């Protein structure tokens, strides 16, 4: 190796190596003080890109987890309010059952209706005041809302909330006021009152054609229609008023047949006498007779059986039993029809009932001939009968209220079931998000974080190299001094 003064190759080489070890030492110190292996793009360009992408995902997952927790809280708030609504509806139903009992007077039912009105108002108040984060949940304005539960666009879970006010929940009804017919047949009793034909039910994505035989009772028709389309329930009733008048010189005798059971009534002289004899045979006939404060006798078959009156020879020289059936407008007909009259030939009179259809969802009814109107009154698209409209101040109104409240409860229960399902869905989503976030964080750590064991070893190595390089540089810088020995 040449001996020179102007150029000290050994020193330059030592400086280069010392500079490299110094840079490595600085890098180790930075990694150990920050805890990150990658502090800038120069440390690992590809690793920085991957770790940043993972950081974005982790941040999004954490936000999505908070969003899902908000969804659970909202669903719990709505579900809690619906629980109170359920309690109110159950109370209204209890009151309706109490009002439907024949032991109540008109004044009793009016008092019960006052509590129903208060419960109706509270039901609406709950729907109007239930809020979460400033948003009303049960007044019908919420609709369907999406919750972002993922770190990417359109990763959502939807919550739908319906209007739960008293005016919004209830039953889609046909025949809610009832309708009936009275037909007289001379001689032996035969099927009469309802003509044969078909009633068409459309709803729930299905169409069902119900065949009706001539003379079918409302009970038989209801049994055919109950559950024929999704969510549809059918209830049959026979309701009519009866009056005994003009009995002179003796009494009236006649048979009453309900379904397959017949009872002979003898010595009937007044409306009260008719009511007493019917009630004494109530367990056999399955009908009830009640006289209200105005002296009006109402006879009811809660199952919708046909009620037949068969005349016998009586001792009265004059007198009659006349009935009024309920029309499709809910009112009893103005003109009474004689079903038993003294001194007449043997006849059989058949009083038919009506069918009420209820469903929490919309449907329609039509029929061939006169079947639909005979059974349901003016049948058409089902009309919504809400909880706000129920009135239990009459026995029939109480019966209708039970059906309306039952469907309202079904709607509330369905909404609560949806909320329970979405809460479980949110919980499962949170568990999944937490798992993904944990694994993504672990992956980012392996890429970006400092391995302290390896880095402290590198630090020790670089410190030794730094010290050795400094010492060797001092020696290398002394090499040009050898020239002086040649000059002596």
Swiss-Prot record:
Phosphorylated on tyrosine residue(s). The keyword Transcription regulation does not apply. Keywords: Bacterial flagellum, Phosphoprotein, Secreted. GO terms for biological process: bacterial-type flagellum-dependent cell motility. Coiled coil: none annotated. Its main location: secreted. It is found in: Secreted; Bacterial flagellum. InterPro entries: Flagellin, Flagellin_C, Flagellin_C_sub2, Flagellin_hook_IN_motif, Flagellin_N. GO terms for cellular component: bacterial-type flagellum; extracellular region. It comes from the Bacteria. The keyword Secreted applies. Disulfide bonds: none annotated. GO terms for molecular function: structural molecule activity. Belongs to the bacterial flagellin family. Flagellin is the subunit protein which polymerizes to form the filaments of bacterial flagella. This is B-type flagellin. It comes from Pseudomonas aeruginosa (strain ATCC 15692 / DSM 22644 / CIP 104116 / JCM 14847 / LMG 12228 / 1C / PRS 101 / PAO1).
């Amino acid at each position: 190796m040449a001996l020179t003064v102007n150029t000290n190759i050994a020193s330059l080489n030592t400086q280069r190596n010392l500079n490299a070890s110094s840079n490595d030492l600085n890098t180790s110190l930075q990694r150990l003080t920050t805890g990150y292996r990658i502090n800038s793009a120069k440390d690992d360009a590809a690793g920085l890109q991957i770790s940043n992408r993972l950081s974005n995902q982790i941040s999004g997952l954490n936000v999505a987890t908070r969003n899902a927790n908000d969804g659970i809280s909202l669903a719990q708030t709505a579900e809690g309010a619906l629980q109170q609504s359920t309690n109110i509806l159950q109370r209204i139903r209890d009151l309706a059952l109490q009002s439907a009992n024949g032991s109540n007077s008109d004044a009793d039912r009016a008092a019960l209706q006052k509590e129903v009105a208060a419960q109706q108002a509270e039901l609406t108040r709950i729907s109007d005041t239930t809020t979460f984060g400033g948003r009303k949940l049960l007044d019908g304005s919420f609709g369907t809302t999406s919750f972002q539960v993922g770190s990417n666009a359109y990763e959502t879970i939807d919550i739908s909330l319906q209007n739960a006010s008293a005016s919004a929940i209830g039953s889609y009804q046909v025949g809610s006021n009832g309708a009936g017919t009275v037909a007289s047949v001379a001689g032996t009793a035969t099927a009469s009152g309802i003509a044969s034909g078909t009633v068409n039910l459309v709803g729930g994505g299905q169409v069902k054609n119900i065949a009706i035989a001539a003379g079918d009772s409302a009970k038989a028709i209801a049994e055919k229609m109950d559950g024929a389309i999704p969510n549809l329930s059918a209830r049959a009733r026979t309701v009519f008023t009866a009056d005994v008048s003009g009995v002179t010189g003796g009494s009236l005798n006649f048979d009453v047949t309900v379904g397959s059971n017949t009872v002979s009534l003898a010595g009937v002289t007044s409306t009260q006498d008719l009511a007493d004899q019917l009630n004494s045979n109530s367990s056999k006939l399955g009908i009830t007779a009640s006289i209200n404060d105005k002296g009006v006798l109402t006879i009811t078959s809660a199952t919708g059986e046909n009620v037949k009156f068969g005349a016998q020879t009586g001792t009265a020289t004059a007198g009659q039993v006349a009935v009024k059936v309920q029309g499709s407008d809910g009112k009893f007909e103005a003109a009474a029809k004689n079903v038993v009259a003294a001194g007449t030939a043997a006849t059989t009179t058949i009083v038919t009932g009506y069918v009420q259809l209820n469903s929490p969802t919309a449907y329609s009814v039509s029929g061939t001939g006169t079947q639909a109107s005979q059974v349901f009154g003016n049948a058409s698209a089902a009309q919504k009968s809400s909880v706000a409209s129920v009135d239990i101040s009459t026995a029939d109104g109480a019966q209708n209220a039970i059906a309306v409240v039952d469907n309202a409860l079904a709607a509330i229960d369905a909404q609560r079931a949806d909320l329970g399902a979405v809460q479980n869905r949110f919980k499962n989503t949170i568990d999944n998000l937490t798992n993904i976030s944990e694994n993504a964080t672990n992956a980012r750590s392996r890429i970006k974080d400092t391995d302290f064991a390896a880095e402290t070893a590198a630090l020790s190595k670089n410190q030794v190299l730094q010290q050795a390089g400094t010492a060797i540089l001092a020696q290398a810088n002394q090499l040009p001094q050898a020239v002086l020995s040649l000059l002596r």
